[in-house]
Amino acid sequence: SLFELCKVTLSNGVVGVGETMPYYTWGEVTDEAVDRANGKHPASVMWDDSLGAGLQMALFDAVGKSLDTPVWALLGRKVRSFAHVGWWAIDMPVEDWILECAEAVKQGYTTFKTKARPWFDLEDQVARLSDAVPDHFKLDMDFNDFGLDPAIARPLCKRLEQFKKVAIWESPIAQEDVEGNRTLRQHLSVPIAHHIDRPAFETQIRR
């Protein structure tokens, strides 16, 4: 993957850093976005999702450093004290997932992000994968909206929650379905994670 690193230097000398994956997020940070942010108070532009992930991340980083406060305090309440180091792979037969995870564990990774897809038997896959990885190793199941709606996603995820190594449901249904995601959040014990760009980030953290 190609990464774009963004560095913001404030008038007080504080430096904020962010990153973009140009072919995975919504593209590179443009010169126009840099011009819009340049010379502005960072807190006045850091909520502008159109700036691009790397620049927006760098602005949050700079504001947090200037206030001597962690970025989570700018977003809301603290929800975790650490983050897993994740290994990523696409949807594939469970035998291949097991091989991927064996290599991930060998290299020191602590979680496995993969694609939950309806053309595989997810319950069988998650059961066999859970048995194959150590107790500290967690699973992040990314549906990319393939759960379709709460009526389908809720019972499936509830059945999969019996496997305690499942740590995250990522985009189980369309992220724009705010009420549907609220319903899932109310009935599922495993947290739901979303990409930060849709719906608007302010909508995500408020609702």
Residue ranges and their predicted role:
Residues 7-69:
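Metal- or metallocofactor-binding catalytic centers and their adjacent structured scaffolds
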Residues 16-18, 83-89, 110-114, 137-143, ...:
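Hydrophobic faces of well-ordered beta-strands that scaffold small-molecule active sites
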Residues 120-207:
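Catalytic core of soluble alpha/beta enzymes
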Residues 80-113, 120:
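Active-site-proximal, glycine-rich beta->alpha crossover segments in alpha/beta enzymes
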Residues 1-7:
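Short, Gly/Pro- and small/polar-rich lid/capping loops
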Residues 67-91, 134:
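N-terminal small/glycine-rich loop or linker at the start of catalytic domains
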Residues 69-75, 94-102, 127:
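Short, charged beta->alpha transition segments
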